[in-house]
């Protein structure tokens, strides 16, 4: 233990407080124990690595910001930390609780998987729906909801006496429901994608946590809960404060194990990530609810003309054939399509819920995009009850001629200008490979400049967000300190009156002056703390305002980045289809052409081992097994395997000595790593293309080609440094 001020541990099992001095634990909680505390317990050097042998340990829970005792059998050792913590307090011997068995009921997981609890079109598990409905029928209270204490484990989920529950019991039951699930709502894989979305250029993080990244039942449950928490925050006196408090309470429940700082890099977990993620998600839902138009009132009964195709005796037009129907596209792409378009421009896409029959109409009005949900029940469609249209095509056709103002006075427009999926602009105007390459170089440079600007803003945003969190914590500490001093002042004032009266009778002027001086000093100290807190609150408000401005600047850059990336990609696709050499494309992109590998010298491309699928396709193995197969291999060694995402594959490739993973999508146009590159008729065609084409065009960190099939003969490990 010599040299380390403290040691960090991570909770493996949940633990419920048994005594006032105990700490509540959730899996993934980070705990710090001082070296002095362990020495006081008689722990020898090296003994800190075996917490199950130590017994009860005094420490600090970084999630709850509380100190207390926790059982060493419930945690695992992480490593030393340079954090000094107060020494232990004396306590008597106490037996340890039994270490929970993996998968046993000791952990409190008594509910079945979400997939076994409900099925679409239900929005969420019936238990959760009942609890939320009961809470929203009563007065919403974000303070009760955001308490860090964990509820007692519940074994009866029949909810038969729900009407008799008070507000606190309802709030605790929602948390207890999440704790009782056998697995976190946000899977580790989805959390890793969300972590990347927080760091990289992307749209709202909520779009990442949709199927197939997050399983359907988890995605529906998460969306239902986020909508509820968003309503709770909006009704709070201070929505921003409520969002942070709710995220602190629910983040560790929805995401029990924080992801590591990078993928496959062995970095330490990010302890605040569950809170940061949920804070962003709830904030997005609050903003979405604020931006959405008011609920549509019932539609007045009105005779509607028959569709033209039916009137002429033809068959009704198909939704798939409608020019304004774009299918499954993201909200960001919709925003891009409607950018700088006149009022009345519109398109229809599949709803983000991915439930069959649900659609979203996006309409341009007042320079903004208005989202209108298309409801569906029993084969009928509409914007609100009653649902009178027999198809989405019939619904849209009707409002090509009728104003939406009858539903919402602010939507005083018709569906005038459809965004046609058949008339997309031809971006590439040049007609020669050299001219297209030169223009690609210009767009790529613009994209890199914008990316650097965004990265700088993101670093500044992250830094200021951390500082804001520290200041919020400091204000909480000030509040506790003021409370202690004021209680001390009240006690002193009460006692001082008795002693002053006594010393006045005795004529002891010296003691009277000492008591009065102490009282004045205490009042002065309280005033100083109040003043410091006020100054800190002012700094917090100013910095929060600056932080919001940075966020706005980042958001304003995102559409430009997406547009430049899209244009650059279309130029790359054009060059690839025209047979441009990859070496030349690399020069235009400013990518250094690597030295020739053992296969690039082959005159006959048919002799490449890449033609043999058995050299690189390994079938159904998981990420860990793939990393084991590629361990110690040279850069560019790769394999293709089945992905955990249904209908997709995964490419695992060695980059700078580490194994990286990327999804290969299978779409109607072919295989590929991303749109618009899903062009390859088979996995073999894709592998042969990226044998000489760098993956860097898809991800700046993937500076390799698919050079060496993992099962091909030839040198495997990298050569030793000379």
Curated annotation (Swiss-Prot):
Residues 4-80 form the SH3 domain. The record marks 147 as: Arginine finger. SUPFAM superfamilies: GTPase activation domain, GAP, SH2 domain, SH3-domain. GO terms for molecular function: phosphatidylinositol 3-kinase regulatory subunit binding; phosphotyrosine residue binding; protein heterodimerization activity; protein phosphatase binding; receptor tyrosine kinase binding. The keyword Ribosomal protein does not apply. Transmembrane segments: none annotated. The modification Phosphotyrosine is found at residues 458, 599, 649. Residues 324-419, 616-710 form the SH2 domain. GO terms for biological process: cellular response to insulin stimulus; insulin receptor signaling pathway; intracellular glucose homeostasis; negative regulation of MAPK cascade; phosphatidylinositol 3-kinase/protein kinase B signal transduction; positive regulation of cell adhesion; positive regulation of protein import into nucleus; positive regulation of transcription by RNA polymerase II. It comes from the Eukaryota. Residues 87-98 have a biased composition (Pro residues). Residues 84-108, 287-319 are annotated as: Disordered. Residues 112-293 form the Rho-GAP domain. GO terms for cellular component: cytosol; focal adhesion; nucleus; phosphatidylinositol 3-kinase complex, class IA. Phosphorylated in response to signaling from activated receptor-type protein kinases. Dephosphorylated by PTPRJ. Dephosphorylated at Tyr-649 by PTPN13. Phosphorylation of Tyr-649 impairs while its dephosphorylation promotes interaction with FBXL2 and SCF(FBXL2)-mediated polyubiquitination. Ubiquitinated. Polyubiquitination by the SCF(FBXL2) complex probably promotes proteasomal degradation of PIK3R2. Belongs to the PI3K p85 subunit family. PANTHER family: PHOSPHATIDYLINOSITOL 3-KINASE REGULATORY SUBUNIT, PHOSPHATIDYLINOSITOL 3-KINASE REGULATORY SUBUNIT BETA. The SH2 2 domain is required for interaction with FBXL2 and PTPN13. Heterodimer of a regulatory subunit PIK3R2 and a p110 catalytic subunit (PIK3CA, PIK3CB or PIK3CD). Interacts with AXL. Interacts with FLT1 (tyrosine-phosphorylated) and FLT4 (tyrosine-phosphorylated). Interacts with FBXL2; PIK3R2 is a substrate of the SCF(FBXL2) complex. Interacts with PTPN13; dephosphorylates PIK3R2. Interacts with NYAP1, NYAP2 and MYO16. Interacts with XBP1 isoform 2; the interaction is direct and induces translocation of XBP1 isoform 2 into the nucleus in a ER stress- and/or insulin-dependent but PI3K-independent manner. This is Phosphatidylinositol 3-kinase regulatory subunit beta. It comes from Mus musculus (Mouse).
């Amino acid at each position: 233990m010599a040299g380390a001020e403290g040691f960090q541990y991570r909770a493996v099992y949940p633990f419920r407080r048994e005594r006032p001095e105990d700490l509540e634990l959730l899996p993934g909680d980070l705990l710090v124990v001082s070296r002095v505390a362990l020495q006081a317990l008689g722990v020898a050097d090296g003994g800190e690595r075996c917490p199950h042998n130590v017994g009860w340990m005094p420490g600090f829970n970084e999630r709850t910001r509380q100190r207390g005792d926790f059982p060493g059998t419930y945690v695992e050792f992480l490593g030393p930390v340079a954090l000094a913590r107060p020494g232990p307090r004396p306590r008597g011997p106490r037996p340890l609780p039994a270490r929970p068995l993996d998968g046993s009921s000791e952990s409190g997981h008594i509910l079945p998987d979400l997939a076994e609890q409900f099925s679409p079109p239900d929005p969420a598990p019936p238990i959760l729906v009942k609890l939320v409905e009961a809470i929203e029928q009563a007065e919403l209270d974000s303070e009760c909801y955001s308490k860090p204490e964990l509820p007692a484990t519940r074994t009866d989920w029949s909810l038969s006496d729900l009407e008799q529950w008070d507000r606190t019991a309802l709030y605790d039951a929602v948390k207890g429901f999440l704790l009782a699930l056998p697995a976190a709502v946000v899977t580790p894989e989805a959390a890793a994608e969300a972590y990347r979305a927080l760091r990289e250029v992307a749209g709202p993080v909520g779009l990442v946590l949709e199927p197939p990244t997050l399983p359907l039942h988890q995605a529906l449950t998460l969306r239902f809960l986020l909508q509820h928490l968003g309503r709770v925050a909006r009704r709070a006196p201070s929505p921003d404060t409520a969002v942070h408090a709710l995220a602190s309470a629910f983040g560790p429940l929805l995401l029990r194990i924080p992801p590591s700082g990078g993928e496959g890099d062995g970095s330490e977990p990010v302890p605040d990530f569950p809170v940061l993620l949920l804070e962003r998600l709830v904030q997005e839902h609050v903003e979405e609810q604020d931006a959405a138009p008011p609920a549509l009132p019932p539609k007045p009964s009105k005779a509607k003309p028959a569709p033209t195709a039916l009137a002429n005796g033809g068959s009704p037009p198909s939704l798939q054939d409608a020019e304004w129907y774009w299918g499954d596209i993201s909200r960001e792409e919709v925003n891009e399509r409607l950018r700088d378009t006149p009022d009345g421009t519109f398109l229809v896409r599949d709803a983000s819920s991915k439930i069959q029959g649900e659609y979203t109409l996006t309409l341009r009005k007042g320079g903004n995009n208005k989202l209108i949900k298309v409801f569906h029940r029993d084969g009928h469609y509409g914007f609100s009850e009653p649902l009178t249209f027999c198809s989405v095509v019939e619904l849209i056709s009707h409002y090509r001629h009728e104003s939406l103002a009858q539903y919402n006075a602010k939507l005083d427009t018709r569906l005038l200008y459809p965004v046609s999926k058949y008339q997309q602009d031809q971006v590439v105007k040049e007609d020669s490979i050299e001219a297209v390459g030169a223009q690609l170089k210009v767009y790529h440079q613009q994209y890199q400049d914008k990316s650097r600007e965004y990265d700088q803003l993101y670093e500044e945003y992250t830094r200021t967000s951390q500082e804001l969190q520290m200041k919020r914590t400091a204000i909480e500490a000030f509040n506790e300190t003021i409370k202690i001093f004021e209680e001390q002042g009240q006690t002193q004032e009460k006692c001082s009156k008795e002693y002053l009266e006594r010393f006045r009778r005795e004529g002891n002027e010296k003691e009277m002056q000492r008591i009065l001086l102490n009282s004045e000093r205490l009042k002065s100290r309280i005033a100083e703390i109040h003043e410091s807190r006020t100054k800190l609150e002012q700094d917090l408000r100013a910095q929060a305002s600056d932080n919001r401005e940075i966020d706005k600047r980042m958001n304003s850059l995102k559409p430009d980045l997406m547009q430049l990336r899209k244009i650059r990609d279309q130029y790359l696709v054009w060059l690839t289809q025209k047979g441009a050499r990859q070496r030349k494309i690399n020069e235009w992109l400013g990518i250094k052409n690597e030295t020739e590998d053992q296969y690039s010298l082959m005159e006959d491309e048919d002799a490449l081992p890449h033609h043999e699928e058995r050299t690189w396709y390994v079938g159904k193995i998981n990420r860990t097994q793939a990393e084991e197969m590629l361990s110690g291999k040279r850069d560019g060694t790769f394999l293709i395997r089945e992905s955990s995402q249904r209908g997709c594959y995964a490419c695992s490739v060695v980059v700078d000595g580490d194994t990286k993973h990327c999804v290969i999508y299978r779409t109607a146009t072919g295989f590929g790593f991303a749109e618009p590159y899903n062009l390859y008729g088979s996995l073999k065609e894709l592998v042969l293309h990226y044998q000489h084409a760098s993956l860097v065009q898809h991800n700046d960190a993937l500076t390799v080609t698919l050079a060496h099939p993992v099962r091909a003969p030839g040198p495997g490990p990298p050569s030793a440094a000379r």
